[in-house]
Amino acid sequence: MNTILVTGGCGYIGAHTIVDLIENGFDVVSADNNSRSNENILNAVEKITGKTVKNYKVDLCIYDDTCAIFQENPDIVGIIHFAAYKAVGESVEKPLMYYENNLDSLINILKCADEFAIPNFVFSSSCTVYGNPDAIPVTEETPMKPAESAYGRTKQMGEKIVNDAVNANKNNAILLRYFNPVGAHPSTLMGEIPLGKPQNLVPAITQTAIGKLPVMKVWGNDYPTKDGSCVRDYIHVCDIAHAHTLALNYLLQNKNETNCDIFNLGTGDGLTVLEIINAFEKISGVKLNYEMGPRRSGDVIAIYANNDKAKKLLGWLPKYSLQHMMDTAWKWELKLKDDEKIYNHPGRDIN
């Protein structure tokens, strides 16, 4: 039996990845302390897959508690590590909290992987490691520039930590640098559940459209882009999820040529914030109430991916269009309005 540990399994990308893993024949256990997620999302996983997933509600920054997961699950053959704080703006305001949480948890998981002889590790990294690149699209060989936020620096440091660890203990790892995951599962049974005021663009759009937020801020209108707003590479969360399954199989089948490999996960299309708003308005039929604001600390000007390597080596091909991303995100927001009690969390109060 091939069991995969997914840390942060109750989170947005983690839960979608669990679904994809199960649909591809894996057994899964989750580790998530639910400080920024909701364990009820695993009920949606069960509805979609017919499988119950156990979640260990532990703080991965505590080594002994982390070890207990592996002691109870000796059949774990791989780890996908999502668990981390991820809000760029918050990381600028609270950098030490980000360094402590994101790096301590990573180190503990890697120590356990070594102690319990688990050779396959997939790390949830980010395009923030590139900083403000000199040229776009970025390839995996694009030099890292200084990250614009503490969050980005934890990902830069995290990549180096993983690389050093697997080269020292002769294990294998893949670093997945993904760009901007959006959308929801096509079943509309699961999607993103922001805590507090949303930090990411699409939840801010959908919450404004449905009336949870009175107005949405577009941060910056003076960037050197086609309309003055930031450029990003938006990709459907299910495409991101499937890439993790492919990466894991790549390691399990010993296809990797190095101990630590890197893949970009993006569509390759750079879109401005205003273009995303326009796409949402066309799909939903809702005119969005937004206003322009100043630049936000930590944001890069423009970034999007060259994804040729993932296509060639992993056999990964993004299949969801921008229209599908906006459509599923909006349908999920409409459903979430009805399911508010199910996903109630102190941080959901956005007033």
Go through each PLM region and give its residues.
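C-terminal substrate-binding subdomain of Rossmann-fold SDR/epimerase-dehydratase oxidoreductases
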Residues: 58, 204-351
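Conserved NAD(P)H cofactor-binding loop of Rossmann-fold oxidoreductase domains
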Residues: 82-86, 125-126
